[in-house]
Amino acid sequence: MAKHLFTSESVSEGHPDKIADQISDAVLDAILEQDPKARVACETYVKTGMVLVGGEITTSAWVDIEEITRNTVREIGYVHSDMGFDANSCAVLSAIGKQSPDINQGVDRADPLEQGAGDQGLMFGYATNETDVLMPAPITYAHRLVQRQAEVRKNGTLPWLRPDAKSQVTFQYDDGKIVGIDAVVLSTQHSEEIDQKSLQEAVMEEIIKPILPAEWLTSATKFFINPTGRFVIGGPMGDCGLTGRKIIVDTYGGMARHGGGAFSGKDPSKVDRSAAYAARYVAKNIVAAGLADRCEIQVSYAIGVAEPTSIMVETFGTEKVPSEQLTLLVREFFDLRPYGLIQMLDLLHPIYKETAAYGHFGREHFPWEKTDKAQLLREAAGLK
């Protein structure tokens, strides 16, 4: 695999699935602010003129789901009917039940350290030293493109932009190292009045060029900007949106494996979310410590059981110490029991809405992005 191409995509906060994710996590945050021990599994569906919020929530908190929903849609930028979706006039329906007591008895324990996993499942975490944030470059730059689209839309630089957008970046690799960008796709919703030529020029100058490193762009790099020629109808009017449908965008852009569980709308007792964050934390610290250039962690659980049923460390031949030693170091320095990882990463706080667009990983202010264990791991591994 000397030379190859690899592609990742991202979507903006105004993409229908991301609207749903953000509403689900906004509800979660509002509940955790009042009741950190709440059990939340909140799912959202959006379509033209309608939002349906459902799921299972057990809490002492009271939150106004309609207000949270409208505020979230408003912040994203859907504030007028000519966009096909309006925070002020859309219908908001709620169908919320309580978490099953059968699950509760497996999760809740008198001794918090024995808190069981909220479900069975397998989760992956990944890190690589090919970017400054120890994330794969394709997903990192795909995210940054749609973040930039939102920035120039909101600050008025390109006032004809609308909230829905998608990006895709194809990188060229040679012997595992980046040598350039082969192709860039950026599709953005826009108002009626902008013509295609002006849009393409503005997107190139204001979105693509400020984000993608010039040394990776060549005369052979292909650019596809709104390749259909028109993207006026977008957001929930163009497609329905559902929580949890962008799990590869949320993680590593396909560069690492995925256990299948979505994140948004789930409180930290759900290991689909919290253990995936912990696995990223472990992998990132291993790479930051210089123990490997690339690292993938798998962890798995049985419902109602505290100890993980398995922990795997994969370094793709880039390890600087024996793989068996890495596994022992992970078990020594990281508590991957559900309660342990919640405490380790301080997860019982309203920090989740911000994760719901532009990726859960690679943004330094999230607690699972800390590299505070790197030096300890390096010393324990016997590296200077």
Curated annotation (Swiss-Prot):
SUPFAM superfamilies: S-adenosylmethionine synthetase. L-methionine binds at residues 56, 99, 239, 270. Mg(2+) binds at residue 17. One of its GO terms (cellular component) is cytoplasm. One of its GO terms (biological process) is S-adenosylmethionine biosynthetic process. Pathway: Amino-acid biosynthesis; S-adenosyl-L-methionine biosynthesis; S-adenosyl-L-methionine from L-methionine: step 1/1. Residues 99-109 are annotated as: Flexible loop. K(+) binds at residue 43. Coiled coil: none annotated. GO terms for molecular function: ATP binding; magnesium ion binding; methionine adenosyltransferase activity. ATP binds at residues 15, 164-166, 230-231, 239, 245-246, 262, 266. Binds 2 divalent ions per subunit. Binds 1 potassium ion per subunit. Its EC number is 2.5.1.6. It is found in: Cytoplasm. Keywords: ATP-binding, Cytoplasm, Magnesium, Metal-binding, Nucleotide-binding, One-carbon metabolism, Potassium, Transferase. It catalyses: L-methionine + ATP + H2O = S-adenosyl-L-methionine + phosphate + diphosphate. PROSITE patterns: ADOMET_SYNTHASE_1, ADOMET_SYNTHASE_2. Belongs to the AdoMet synthase family. Homotetramer; dimer of dimers. NCBIfam families: metK. Catalyzes the formation of S-adenosylmethionine (AdoMet) from methionine and ATP. The overall synthetic reaction is composed of two sequential steps, AdoMet formation and the subsequent tripolyphosphate hydrolysis which occurs prior to release of AdoMet from the enzyme. This is S-adenosylmethionine synthase. The lineage of its organism: Bacteria, Pseudomonadati, Pseudomonadota, Gammaproteobacteria, Enterobacterales.
